[in-house]
């Protein structure tokens, strides 16, 4: 699924009311009637297409026949569901474009989360309200732990790759990611999984770290990609963000098993409760807390790879709290989309987005 910011779209394309008003002012009589007839035919066509989609696609996409690693979908004898979730507290033309793009590419019918949310579920007041809406769905939707979940921000994420192709791509990406981790340790993938380490939750990436910080582990400790050295041309890594490595977690998109995602979202909300600081400027940023958990996971992985020691020079920068025992979870199976194979963020990528 290649994703773009809908801010590039011309609003006039979707502003039917304004366009109709101009027609009434400039073309009365026969022209107005013709416009109304065309508008009605357009609505009828759209309704017909939606009904056809509902008949043939039903509620959830069947992903049982898509090739996948056995640890991601536990049983090949049941039909795993695909959940397509869109956090959005209001309905507008951007949200409609996001939903339409998903339907056109045969994803399961999107579920809007947090619509008209109030109090602590009001995403207009705090982005972390999005996490509460996601948690509520993952705990109460009745889905199985090995169902596949896709979550996209409701105002700026457009699907462009068909669902079947995206699902196959996801499983391939996670299998390759597990193989790289196993190779780093000189073990097999099965042995890697026995240690509890694996990759299942794939988040989008940014070229810049946000919220910005020179000392926060989110911004300096997370791993670099394995992209070719000059992937962005001769200016790669020369200081301009548009030519830098895309390695920082972006919380706007994620794909992964429902069970793993549920545990991770629960952990993010627990972190918010434990570390809440009313005076912290970015206290309401869901991305801050999610990226903090990712940085701690990577910190512990590097320590485990090096006999309990962190291999890099800290040089006055902050590091996460080390794992404190069996009940202190640091491994959440989080990976990021270094290659833009799942999502293509627009920030700092204007030159490379067609």
Question: What is the predicted role of each segment?
Answer:
Residues 138-214:
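GT-A fold catalytic core of metal-dependent nucleotide-sugar glycosyltransferases
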Residues 110-120, 179-187, 203-205, 279-287, ...:
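A generic structural motif
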Residues 29-148, 175-176, 183-184, 259:
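N-terminal anchoring/stem segment of glycosyltransferases
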């Amino acid at each position: 699924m290649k994703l773009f910011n809908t801010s590039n779209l011309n609003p006039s394309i979707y502003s039917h009311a304004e366009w109709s008003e101009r027609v009434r002012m400039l073309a009365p009589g026969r022209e107005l009637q013709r416009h109304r007839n065309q508008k009605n035919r357009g609505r009828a066509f759209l309704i017909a297409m939606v009904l056809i989609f509902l008949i043939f696609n039903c509620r959830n996409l069947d992903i049982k026949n898509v090739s996948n690693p056995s640890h991601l979908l536990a049983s090949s004898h049941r039909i795993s569901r695909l959940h397509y979730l869109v956090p959005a507290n209001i309905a507008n033309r951007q949200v409609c474009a996001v939903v339409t793009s998903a339907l056109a590419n045969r994803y399961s019918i999107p579920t809007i989360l947090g619509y008209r949310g109030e109090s602590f579920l009001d995403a207009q007041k705090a982005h972390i309200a999005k996490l509460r809406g996601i948690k509520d769905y993952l705990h109460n939707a009745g889905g199985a732990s090995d169902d596949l979940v896709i979550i996209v921000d409701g105002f700026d994420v457009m699907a462009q790759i068909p669902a079947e192709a995206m699902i196959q791509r996801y499983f391939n990406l996670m299998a390759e990611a597990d193989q790289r981790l196993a190779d780093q340790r000189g073990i097999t993938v099965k042995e890697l999984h026995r240690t509890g380490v694996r990759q299942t939750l794939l988040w989008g990436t940014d070229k810049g770290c946000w919220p910005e910080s020179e000392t926060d582990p989110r911004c300096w400790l997370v791993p670099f990609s394995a992209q070719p050295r000059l992937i962005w041309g001769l200016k790669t890594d020369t200081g301009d963000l548009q030519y830098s490595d895309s390695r920082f977690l972006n919380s706007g998109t994620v794909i992964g098993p429902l069970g793993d995602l549920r545990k991770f979202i629960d952990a993010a909300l627990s972190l918010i409760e434990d570390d809440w600081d009313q005076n912290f400027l970015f206290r309401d940023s869901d991305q801050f807390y999610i990226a903090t958990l990712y940085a701690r996971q990577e910190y512990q992985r590097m320590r485990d790879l090096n006999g309990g020691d962190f291999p890099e020079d800290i040089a006055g920068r902050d590091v996460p709290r080390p794992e404190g025992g069996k009940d202190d979870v640091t491994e959440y199976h989080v990976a990021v989309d270094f290659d833009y194979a799942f999502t293509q963020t627009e920030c700092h990528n204007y030159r490379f987005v067609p």
